[in-house]
Amino acid sequence: MNLGSEQILPEDFYLAEEGALLEEMAEEDEEIDLYNEVTFGLDQESDEEPVKLEDDHTKPIQMPEAPKEEEPEALQPVKEAKGSEKAPLHEVKIVVEPHEDHVDLSIDSGGHTMNSTMDDSELGDPAVMKAFHGKPTLESLDSAVVDSGIGSTWSELDTDYDQSGMDSGLWEASPKVSTYATGQILEDKAILRIMERAPYLPPTNLEFLGSPLQRGFMPSQRLQGPEMGAMSPKPYRPRFMRQQSPLVPRSMRPSYPFTPPRRGPSVFAPNQSPGFVSQTPFRPMSPNVSTPTRPMTPKMVRMHFGPMSPSPSFSPFFSPMGNALQRFKVPGHVTQLHPQHRRILSQRQRPQSSSRRQWESRPDPYASLMSQKEKEWVIKLQMIQLQSENPHLDDYYYQAYYENLERKLSEEEFLGERKKREPTKLVTPYIQKAETYESVVHIEGSLGQVAVSTCYSPRRAIDAVSYAMPDEAIKALGYQRLRVLKHAEKVFLMFLEVEELARKMSHIPEEEHVHFQHKQNYKVQRIYDVLKIAPCHNEEESEFLQLLQVGKGKKLVARLLPFLRSEQAREILLLVVQHLTFLIKNDSAEESLSVLYGPLKTIINGLSFTELIGVTQELTRPLPESNDLPLTLAFQNQFGISLLYCLLSHGERLLSSDLPMEPCIGDFEKWTDTVFLVAKELSHVSKSSMVEPLFLPSNLLSLFCRYLDKQTIHKLEDKMECPVIPPYTAVPS
């Protein structure tokens, strides 16, 4: 490198190439410095520092003169003549011309040339040494005055900007930038001009991934130069770039012009080199907050917070730009926010994670299950279900909540804390139904009819209402059957209470059994009285026999027999046997008499020999209207023949047992006559007319062997088809 012709400063090279980045760093640093001043106040050294700075500016530095033919006309230096008797301040202009292979940097001075051999005394100037060794320069010490190497006077930059055709892209990508130093150092007007005028920054894309800042920062190696020695620029961190890259086409840039920020005079003395300085333009967050006009002291400038503090190495973190924060409105009572707080707020305003967006974008799998018409139908049905005759019972929690809410609102209105206003209430419909019974239309020969069924009025299956009708109409319309069914329903409800008490007996303590037993017996006696069980001659007038004509009546008697006393049960058995022919004739349609066989068999097994003879003789008496015996009809009915076999089998057990029978006088003769009569009738009945019994006892042939000959026994065996029994001895004829 020829020092006589040109001298390349690495710091100027960085400033010229990355001017936009340094401008952004300056704005953020100025925000922190102004926050420091507002927070901690001004130092006493603020009055002494400008004097020291002016002394440093008085020492000139000679720079080599560059060829003037490389300088464009648009960037000719404007020389100002000062009338002061002090040492003249030199105007320094830095011209950067990027070429394909190399970069030429030329520096023009105001008439003085630096020799190749520089005195050690001049290099001993503290300001020069600070610039050469990368230490904070005067501009970094006073954050109120900012110069990033783009221009010293903003009027010059405005001239360049006007020549660029009001295009922000040309301002950003301008290849040649000049820097001038004037003699206006640390003037209050310049500071006020920086503080009060906040540049408008258009929103642009953040293209930092492909920028030179991300690919290489000229990192930690120290730059060598024969005239300056080892020098390292001030380390800085990569940041977002607010302006677009020069490689982006002009059509992609904002259509409105970019207004460059106004800055005060440069604070560099002639013997100082612009380095990486602390730049701190700060704009208040609220428009009604004025910016302080006092300059920052070096002591306050040194105070940095968090990631904004100087670091000896490149930090992997970089601060977000202020464009996202320009849309954020801070409350009026908040005057200023620390930059770290602004960074946190900007991070909170970023969009949510991609996983949440994916979840929100998933289609609802149940969205199309019901059509709109079906949804409306369900809503109407649910609204119908809300109707209640007792809201405090059906909707207790909401009613209690609303009562508490009304009480609270009334207290607030009474105390004057709020205006009287009727709160919103979800009204539960209250329906008061009239207690009316509408009888269904009577249809002849039916138990009732199905009424119109709705959700308000369920259907009625039976209309059991009494009507005053003549006897002929009663027989014709079957009114008697309806009356019997009504009577059976009434007795059945009473019997259900008896069964409920019986179920409770197994779960209560033994000391309470007596009480429950008395209660149960009382209810059973009431049912027995209601049935009116008594001997009768006219079967049509007996309510009990009429009850046995319907299936529900037979089932009721079968379930009631185990709860009755023995004498009550024997009376029912006797009535059934006496009127067996009547019951068999009326049971031809339903054939439900078989439900009585089990309970009656239990009663028969408990009869004595005398009682058994009395019940069996009822089957051998001829009918009043004919000469036929009930035995003839009993052989043709399953319930009748089963009942007959059960009576004969129990008699054989009594005769075969060793237990004393205690018979009365003439009981054996009566029993023998009864067995002969049954055998005679059984032998006369054809086999085809006989039915199979519910149960065939095995001791019937033993009974007949006591009184009949061998030929008659074989004939009866063939008809009854009794199982094989041990050999027996027939009675000789």
From Swiss-Prot:
Signal peptide feature range: none
Nucleus in keyword set: yes
UniProt-listed Pfam families: PAT1
Entry's localization field: Cytoplasm; Nucleus
Keyword check for RNA-binding: yes
Major place of residence: cytoplasm
Keyword terms: Cytoplasm, Nucleus, RNA-binding
Superkingdom: Eukaryota
Tissue: Oocyte-specific protein. Expressed throughout oogenesis but is not detectable in eggs, embryos, nor in adult tissues (at protein level).
GO cellular component, one term: cytoplasm
Annotated Basic and acidic residues bias: 49-59
Positions of the UniProt region annotated as Disordered: 42-75, 337-366
GO biological process, alphabetically ordered: deadenylation-dependent decapping of nuclear-transcribed mRNA; negative regulation of cytoplasmic mRNA processing body assembly; negative regulation of translation; P-body assembly
GO molecular function, one term: poly(U) RNA binding
Record's compositionally biased regions (Low complexity): 346-356
Annotated S-S bridges: none
Similarity-based family: Belongs to the PAT1 family.
Subunit structure: Interacts with ribonucleoprotein complex components. Interacts with cpeb.
Function: RNA-binding protein that acts as a translational repressor. When overexpressed, able to disperse P-bodies.
The protein's name: Protein PAT1 homolog 2
UniProt source species: Xenopus laevis
